[in-house]
């Protein structure tokens, strides 16, 4: 929450100088550590890492999202590249969810 407040405060303070400030809130994201974590859980559960991930992102799982898969770190990178580009000048002071559609609440 404090990072969100800092984002909004900075956006207010530096916007007049043409600087944008945003906060990316990623969901469960595949990184270089993901395989190790999935393997550990698979060993505990007695199934394969692929089965662990399939269960995690199956409909009805508390870990799933609307696209039923883990977000890849490159997808967060694409969003970051857009926000750093001149094409995103109108986006500032925002918390941008990039989790594949987690949750059903509307925040505005």
Regions found by a protein language model. Name each.
Residues 1-13, 23:
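Conserved catalytic helix of short-chain dehydrogenase/reductases
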Residues 7-8, 77-80, 84:
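Short-chain dehydrogenase/reductase
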Residues 15, 20, 91-93:
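Short, small/polar-rich loop/turn modules that mediate ligand/substrate recognition or access, typified
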Residues 20-30, 84, 97-99:
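Conserved SDR Rossmann-fold cofactor-binding beta-strand/turn motif
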Residues 25-36, 40, 44-45:
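Short, flexible catalytic-loop segment of classical short-chain dehydrogenase/reductase
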Residues 40, 44-58:
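C-terminal beta-strand-loop-alpha-helix "lid" module of Rossmann-like NAD(P)-dependent dehydrogenases
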Residues 48-51, 62-76, 87:
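A conserved structural motif in NAD(P)-dependent oxidoreductases
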Residues 80-81, 92-108:
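Short C-terminal tail/terminal secondary-structure segment
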């Amino acid at each position: 929450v404090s990072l969100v407040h800092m984002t909004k405060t900075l956006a207010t303070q530096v916007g007049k100088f043409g600087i944008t400030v945003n906060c990316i809130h990623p969901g469960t994201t595949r990184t270089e550590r993901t395989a190790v974590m999935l393997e550990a859980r698979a060993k505990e559960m007695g199934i394969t890492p692929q089965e662990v991930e399939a269960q995690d992102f199956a409909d009805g799982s508390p870990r799933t999202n609307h696209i039923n898969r883990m977000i890849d770190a490159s997808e967060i990178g694409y969003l970051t590249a857009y926000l750093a580009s001149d094409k995103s000048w109108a986006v500032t002071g925002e918390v941008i969810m990039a989790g594949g559609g987690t949750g059903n609440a509307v925040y505005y």
